Curated annotation (Swiss-Prot):
NCBIfam families: NuoG (TIGR01973)
Top class in the EC scheme: translocase
EC numbers: 7.1.1.-
Reported function: NDH-1 shuttles electrons from NADH, via FMN and iron-sulfur (Fe-S) centers, to quinones in the respiratory chain. The immediate electron acceptor for the enzyme in this species is believed to be ubiquinone. Couples the redox reaction to proton translocation (for every two electrons transferred, four hydrogen ions are translocated across the cytoplasmic membrane), and thus conserves the redox energy in a proton gradient.
Family: Belongs to the complex I 75 kDa subunit family.
PROSITE patterns the UniProt entry points to: 2FE2S_FER_2, 4FE4S_HC3, 4FE4S_MOW_BIS_MGD, COMPLEX1_75K_1, COMPLEX1_75K_2, COMPLEX1_75K_3
Organism of derivation: Pseudomonas aeruginosa (strain ATCC 15692 / DSM 22644 / CIP 104116 / JCM 14847 / LMG 12228 / 1C / PRS 101 / PAO1)
Binding site for [4Fe-4S] cluster 3: C228, C231, C235, C263
Name of this chain's protein: NADH-quinone oxidoreductase subunit G
Amino acid sequence: MATIHVDGKTLEVDGADNLLQACLSLGLDIPYFCWHPALGSVGACRQCAVKQYTDENDKRGRLVMSCMTPATDNTWISIEDEEAKQFRASVVEWLMTNHPHDCPVCEEGGHCHLQDMTVMTGHNERRYRFTKRTHQNQELGPFIAHEMNRCIACYRCVRYYKDYAGGTDLGVYGAHDNVYFGRVEDGVLESEFSGNLTEVCPTGVFTDKTHSERYNRKWDMQFAPSICHGCSSGCNISPGERYGEIRRIENRYNGSVNHYFLCDRGRFGYGYVNREDRPRQPLLVLSKQKLSLDGALDQAAALLKERKVVGIGSPRASLESNFALRELVGEGNFYSGINEGELDRLRLILQVMQEGPLPVPSIRDIEDHDAVFVLGEDLTQTAARIALALRQSVKGKAVEMAADMKVQPWLDAAVKNIAQHAQNPLFIASVSATRLDDVAEETVHAAPDDLARLGFAVAHAIDPSAPSVADLDPQAQAFAQRITDALLAAKRPLVVSGNSLGNKALIEAAANIAKALKQREKNGSISLVVGEANSLGLALFGGDSVEAALERLTSGQADAVVVLENDLYRRTDAARVDAALAAAKVVIVADHQQTATTAKAHLVLPAASFAEGDGTLVSQEGRAQRFFQVFDPTYYDARNMVREGWRWLHAIHSTLQGKRVDWTQLDHVTEAVAEAKPILAGIRDAAPAASFRIKGLKLAREPHRYSGRTAMRANISVHEPRTPQDIDSAFAFSMEGYSGSQEDRQQIPFAWSPGWNSPQAWNKFQDEVGGHLRAGDPGVRLIEPKGEGLDWFQAVPVPFSAKADSWKVVPLYHLFGSEENSSRAAPIQQRIPETYVALSKEDADRLGVNDGATLGFQLKGQALRLPLRIDEQLGAGLIGLPVGFAGIPAAIAGCSVEGLQEAAQ
């Protein structure tokens, strides 16, 4: 700690910070542009000037840039010094000489950092009366709009995009006051994290194009704290709604998880919530009859009465909804909705997390590891936010080298110059090239079984008591030794693996490496990636596979099925699903999307998406997190009967039993889950109860400037209805409630503080800028390792051997296209590649086919015709297929393809 003196006040700060960060952490306001908590200091904008004095007797002082000045002990500064204030105002004024006068039509207006800083400096009159510099804008794809004339040349965009996120197609061109930030030519921004430019940019150069198409100001949107459902990472988001539509998604700061950044799937994949073809009223499918609320409950109860019912849950539904289904059908009749192979691997992952020797790190904690081995995962496609964290972990070497030279880590340019190209080691073993390969020390591409053999070899090299690998070729053995040396040399090694390749041996090999590291007394971690937002929650919750449920229907052991938020055709073979649904006398589906399964239902119940309901998810870290309802859809249309899955299912259960509904609010069902499943007892603490208040007030979902509420339904009726009442949470569907930053709270719908309207307002909610929220980061970890309860896994697979007339399927994942719901969003659909089949160059040459040729083959009894994509990194004997794409069967990992040949045109 250090003592600094600011305008006559003596304050305690972290001496490792710069003055700007230290003062912001104290709640003091200093305007800035180029500095960002995640990017460090470069001193480019000169906006954060303060007056520094030699000591208490110095009356003259000198101007310094606070972002470039360390907060050393006994520093004397003034923020309110008149010369410093005039200097800061002059900086804003000359930045404004070329900035257009377009705030009323700029999408950034109302959450613009430039607006905030201009007001903060007191600049309110333009004296420049001459021609402004202008630029040609670029077309950057479906996610981001480009308006270069608004640029103030703070360099944040390229520092984030190139230096932080590893992008290569955005740069800065030109010189002096005529610089241009963009691509060499028009084209889609290639980075999977490009959407963060909309929050990193302090002006309106890069704006959310998906929001611009249905635009409204930040102060006119209703927000709620939510969790991204796009993968298992558990990123915190703030969805904004107007007129019953989600208009945009902003990053919600969580110092342990996503920090300041999201991936593009999570930011732009919300369009499925707004689709016109969503179920919004209960429907008898055969007669196409829409039902009332009571009619739907009576119909469901009549259909299920005296039936042998099974329930199929879902890893994309909340714990509460899955529990309500289990209560409806009985514990022995509840099935997880996950295919048997994936469920088996999930149980193994859970065993490793619970009984293994090493902890699972948070995403933020991943950045602090100094040697990483990724085994079998293409993380940018399966858990993109973890991939971004790994990009930061390799930069730890630069910080370490800078510390040895007494250079502070926030001096961004100096740290980079010291390190040059030195990085912490990252090793990647995958079936094909990944988007992280550019920062990896070494990569290897091989069949899943061979990757697992490499992992087992690494474990054995770390600790010879681990099972050895027979017949490992010398090249692989040498590679395993290099990985071993790096992991043992590290202070905090990390091994990352997961479920995506459908190979159990990969997870077992990763677990052996973790055990071996613990045996060598390394302070390491293990991170295991799972498929969906609540996959780990379902593994904790229990329930057999979807195939087991279908078998009960096909065999006649059950004659009715209730399916919760699950398209069974994406889980297992279509023929098996067809047979089971045909055998069932009653099929009831509760979902928020039209799917192949809802088309086969007798009764469809409109379930809530994440935007219309509350619930709890468990991320791949084992962190239980609550998402909250953003808006009440019935406010805009009384015919809309969308309800949370747990509400529908509990109401049906109560109707069947002829009793009143017991669970009238979320806290009731959450408490019931916690009591029924002791391992899930911690979900009580995932968020405050509905009774939580600050100064006697509920928490406001809407900014206090929210306008038009009394006119929003005037086209329906001039009589204004009562504001929807939220009995499930501590939030109000109103601007009336607490929305400030002074009182500590974890669940924050939107970031706003007086004078701070942009995303930089998160500074006001943190214990220190870039640290954790003052009230603690949202969520609660449910799983901690027990130590030495896990034995060595012994089943080392045999080497993969390519065959002349048969190919082994490896699943290939795409950030845009492999996840079910985001793929329904129009902007995401523009980024989904055409369905393809991938072969190695060796196999393509042997078959005599070229890139783009149409290949025909049989897979799981289904005939496919797909264009060929030659993959130089794919091994011979392997055939790659994109997961989740149209026409690709479910559960393809490890299947065999035969009869592969060029199809007749």
